[in-house]
């Protein structure tokens, strides 16, 4: 179902700009122009949801809401919601290449609150009508999300399972009480979501008009502290106190003797099946309205997932439990039609996972950055690919190509040189990109860092390291016409 194509992986928070973090303003449109000049058809991003502690897009307060950090202030000035004076002398961080999330948190929300107060006192009836329409169309998730965020602030940012018992359990009287008490806060968060989706939908429309599709991302699990978990406790494995019975993780392996303890709540798949997986159907539906294609993270968890007893400090005592399998995807497909989905099928693969991916028809993933272990044959080398896969030079979880090459064992470096017919180490990233683009994979994608030949300083995430992630930003002016022409030439040669 996917045409031969290529694209760039680049999350909007990493866009350059003057407000400390990438936004959905003019730099987003300039990046789409760069994609078009480069003859790219795909822009891949991370999940767009609101981020919390650790700033990871993969641990969001909602599977449906948008990240307020991405709202562009210049567009709010154009809409007469803020003035240039409001933004004068505000500290958004002092390094244009790294996001200072503390500064963003401290400055962004007061400015968005000011925009909301200006909106309330304005006579912009057209925008007020648009907000009411937005609330109606998105009520299935928005009502719970805006109440959840308002409650979270009310309870000093505590996770929902530490709130007062009556509202933690969503008792009717408590729900009504807090909806009344926090009414203005709730409307403020409705307004923020309205702004986000207005700006995002305009960006997406511009991309589509220029022949570019956006690939979004769905983490399989939701965050423990999320409106999803608070508002839908029946679809998770919680006890009577709304504490998880078991949580998600990954078993011990060659890289980790204790495995990985992710801590996300696990789904009650039996309960979900009773509703024909309606929550998952709505989640996919929402993501396919904000993006054109979606990558589903940890696809193997739909075949079987590692369930760890709640309270354990490592993942050692977990066990495999069966996922919903093809039944889930049949239910989604029967309600939404053909599914433009990429299956993230990395990690521990079994025949059962391979069979499930083949039954869905979804393309899996190949990571070229994993291919050059000289000690063993592996299926990340391009000559092993089939058409129904997506090749990445790297993802958010691994080092840049140049960073990998600088740290790799010499025999692995030499294997990469030999395999890619590389004549100069300072061109290794281009030789790897050529290897991906020339392959039979239906889609080829490279992080923007690899096109620029950046090293480990531009790595956006190091799994298992708690701080310093998701901060990297692109410098202004590095996406040149010369770079676009070089990418375009490669793309034309290999009919992408």
Residue ranges and their predicted role:
Residues 36, 200-208, 333, 357-358:
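Surface-exposed amphipathic alpha-helices with a cationic face
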Residues 189, 194-222:
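Conserved, well-ordered alpha-helix/loop/beta-strand core segments that scaffold catalytic motifs
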Residues 26-51, 290-291:
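Catalytic domains of carbohydrate-active enzymes, especially glycoside hydrolases
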Residues 46, 213-215, 219, 293, ...:
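Outer-envelope exported proteins of Gram-negative bacteria
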Residues 1-4, 9-37, 192:
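Asp/Glu-centered strand-loop micro-motifs enriched in Gly/Pro and often flanked by an aromatic residue
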Residues 37, 167, 174, 472, ...:
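Domain-scale activation on soluble regions of proteins
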Residues 2-4, 11, 55-193, 197, ...:
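Alpha-amylase-like alpha-glycosidases and glucanotransferases acting on alpha-linked glucans and related
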